[in-house]
Design a protein with these regions (language model features):
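Periplasmic alpha-helical coiled-coil/stalk elements that build and connect Gram-negative outer-membrane
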Residues: 196-310, 414, 418, 459-461
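Short, charged, amphipathic alpha-helical segments
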Residues: 105, 182, 245-254, 450-458
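Alpha-helical heptad-repeat coiled-coil segments that mediate oligomerization/polymerization in large
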Residues: 244, 404, 411, 449-450
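Short segments within alpha-helical structural elements
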Residues: 120, 257-282, 418, 427-487
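Bacterial Sec-pathway N-terminal export signals of envelope proteins
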Residues: 19-131, 137, 284, 291-325, ...
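Acidic, low-complexity, intrinsically disordered peripheral segments
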Residues: 1-53, 136, 466-499
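Small/polar-residue-enriched beta-strand and adjacent coil segments characteristic
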Residues: 83-86, 125-195, 304-310, 314, ...
Length: 499
C-alpha cells in the first residue's frame, strides 16, 4: 500500500471528516478506513401455483406452490360460530397473513439494511470518547538518567475529551458497492410485490379446490339417493319374486360404494378447508363455509404475443431479476475499483489536560491517499467472482423471460382445452343421467335386470367427476393466466368472472 499523508495543525478549532479512531494521551489520532462489501440480493423462484385436486378416483396433474405460500401466521382466535368466507375475504386475509408475503417483506427489510450499511461508507462518521489516565513513569527503564533528577515521574493524570470524524472523499469501490446494494434492495422490493400475486394464486387455487370438493359431495349425495332408490326397487322386485337376489346384492354394493365415496369426499373437503385456513391465517378450529361458487364463465380469447408483451411490462419478478443484473454489473465495477486509489480525510478535536479545569484544545487533521501496489491474486479473484455473478444473473433473467413466455402460452392452452372439456363433460353428464333414467325404467318395468342400472350409475359418477375436474381446471387456468400476466392481485375477479 502506497500512502501519501498530509498532516495539518493549527491553534484554532477545525472540522474535518470521518473515521473512528483511538487517540493517544497526547492527543494524537489513529487512522480508520471503511471498506465496502458486495450486498447480496434475494433470488425469487416463480413456480406455477397449482395445488393437487384429489378425488376418490385419482388426482390431476396440478403443480404445488412453494411451501412458504401454504403457511401463514394466525390472525385472531376462533369465534366458535360459523364464518361465511367469500373468495375476496380469503384473498384479503391471505395478503395480510400469508407466510410467503411475510418472508418476502422481511427479505426486503434485510436488503434495505444492507443498503444503509453500504451508504454509511459514503457518509461522514462521527464518534466520541472520554478518558482519564493516571501514570507513573520510570525514566531509568528507558535509559534516561540525569544527575540530581529522580527517575520516577508522577504519578500524574491525563484527561482527554475528544471527537473523531472520518470522511471518504474518493472511494469508487464503496460507491459501486452502494449502487449494487441499492439495486438489490429494489429487487427485494419488487419480489415482495410479486409475492402478492403468488398469494392471490395460491389462495384462489385453494378456494377453488374446496369449491370442487363441495361440488363433489353434492354429486355424491345425488348418486347416493339414486343408489338408495335402485336398492329399494331391487329389494321390492326380489320380495315380489320378479328378480333374483343378485340384483339386490348388486344394488346394495352400489349403495355402499356411494356411502364410501361420500365419506371420502367429506373427509377430503375437511382436509382441503384446513389447507385453505393455513394459507389465510384462520385458526384451524374456526368453522367456516364457502359463500362463493365458481360457475363456468368463458374468457375472451387473447393473442399470445400480445399477452407475452403485457407480461413483460407487468411482471414484478422479471423487474426484480433485471435489478439483480444491474446489481451484479455494479459488483463488477466494484471489483475493478479495488485497484484504484482511495482518498479520505479524518481528524479529531478535543480537550487534553491534567483536569477538566486545566486543559487545552488540541486537534489533528489528516488527508490520506492510499493505493494498492501488489495484490494480483486478490484482484483477479474478485474480478472472476464478480464476472461469474453477472453472467449468472444475466442468464437467469434471459431464462426467466422465456419461462414467463411459456407460462403465458401454457395458460392460454389450458384455458382453451379446459373450456372444451367443460362442454364435453357437461354433455356427458346429461347423457349419462338420461341413460340411468332409461335403465331404471326398464328395470322397474321388468324388461331387464339391474346390471344396466349399476353400469349407468358408474358412468354417471364418472361423468360428474370429470365435469367437476374440468370446471376446476378451467378456473385455475384463468387464474394462472392472470398470474402469468402479472395482474393476479388486481384482476383476478375479471378473469374468474370471464369478463
Amino acid at each position: 500500500m502506497l500512502t501519501l499523508t498530509v498532516l495539518c495543525a493549527s491553534l484554532g478549532p477545525a472540522v474535518f471528516a470521518q473515521g473512528p479512531g483511538s487517540s493517544s494521551s497526547a492527543g494524537g489520532s489513529s487512522r480508520g478506513g471503511t471498506t465496502g462489501a458486495n450486498a447480496s440480493g434475494t433470488q425469487s423462484a416463480v413456480p406455477v401455483a397449482q395445488q393437487q385436486l384429489y378425488t376418490s378416483t385419482g388426482a390431476n396433474g396440478a403443480q404445488p406452490t412453494q411451501d412458504s405460500f401454504h403457511g401463514s401466521i394466525i390472525e385472531g382466535k376462533s369465534t366458535g360460530s360459523n364464518l361465511e368466507l367469500s373468495l375476496d375475504d380469503a384473498i384479503q386475509r391471505g395478503l395480510r397473513t400469508n407466510l410467503g408475503i411475510i418472508l418476502q417483506t422481511s427479505a426486503q427489510k434485510n436488503a434495505n439494511g444492507q443498503r444503509l450499511e453500504q451508504l454509511q461508507a459514503l457518509l461522514p462518521t462521527v464518534t466520541g470518547s472520554a478518558s482519564i489516565e493516571v501514570q507513573q513513569v520510570n525514566l531509568a527503564a528507558f535509559g534516561l538518567k540525569f544527575p540530581g533528577v529522580k527517575p520516577i515521574v508522577g504519578p500524574f493524570q491525563v484527561v482527554d475529551f475528544r471527537a473523531y470524524l472520518t470522511q471518504n472523499l474518493v472511494n469508487v469501490q464503496s460507491l459501486e458497492n452502494y449502487i449494487a446494494a441499492k439495486h438489490n434492495f429494489q429487487s427485494a422490493k419488487l419480489t415482495a410485490e410479486d409475492a402478492r400475486d403468488m398469494v392471490v394464486l395460491t389462495v384462489g387455487n385453494a378456494y377453488l379446490i374446496c369449491i370442487a370438493d363441495a361440488s363433489r359431495i353434492e354429486a355424491v349425495h345425488a348418486e347416493l339417493a339414486t343408489s338408495q332408490l335402485s336398492f329399494e326397487q331391487a329389494t321390492a322386485s326380489h320380495d315380489a319374486g320378479v328378480s333374483p337376489r343378485i340384483d339386490v346384492l348388486r344394488a346394495q354394493v352400489d349403495l355402499q360404494n356411494e356411502q364410501q365415496n361420500l365419506i371420502s369426499a367429506t373427509n377430503q373437503l375437511a382436509k382441503d378447508k384446513l389447507a385453505l385456513a393455513r394459507t389465510i391465517g384462520l385458526p384451524l378450529d374456526q368453522p367456516f363455509t364457502l359463500s362463493d361458487t365458481a360457475p363456468f364463465a368463458a374468457l375472451e380469447q387473447m393473442n399470445p404475443q400480445q399477452a407475452f408483451e403485457r407480461a413483460l411490462a407487468a411482471r414484478k419478478d422479471l423487474a426484480a431479476s433485471a435489478e439483480q443484473v444491474k446489481a451484479a454489473r455494479a459488483g463488477q465495477t466494484a471489483a475493478f475499483a479495488d485497484q484504484l486509489p482511495v482518498a479520505r480525510v479524518y481528524g479529531d478535536f478535543g480537550d487534553l489536560g491534567t483536569t477538566p479545569g486545566h486543559s487545552h484544545g488540541t486537534y489533528t487533521a489528516t488527508g490520506e491517499v492510499t493505493a494498492p501496489i501488489l495484490q494480483i491474486a486478490r484482484t483477479r479473484g474478485e474480478k472472476d467472482v464478480a464476472d461469474a455473478q453477472f453472467e449468472t444473473a444475466r442468464a437467469r433473467l434471459s431464462d426467466q423471460i422465456q419461462q414467463v413466455n411459456q407460462e403465458v402460452h401454457d395458460s392460454l392452452l389450458d384455458i382453451e382445452a379446459a373450456a372444451r372439456l367443460v362442454q364435453t363433460t357437461r354433455s356427458n353428464v346429461d347423457l349419462a343421467t338420461e341413460e340411468l333414467s332409461e335403465a331404471q325404467q326398464r328395470f322397474h318395468a321388468g324388461i331387464s335386470d339391474n346390471l344396466p342400472v349399476s353400469q349407468a350409475q358408474a358412468q354417471t359418477e364418472q361423468a360428474n367427476n370429470q365435469y367437476i375436474s374440468a370446471l376446476y381446471q378451467h378456473n385455475v387456468a384463468k387464474l394462472s393466466l392472470a398470474r402469468a400476466l402479472g395482474i393476479a392481485q388486481t384482476n383476478y375477479k375479471e378473469y374468474l368472472g370471464g369478463k
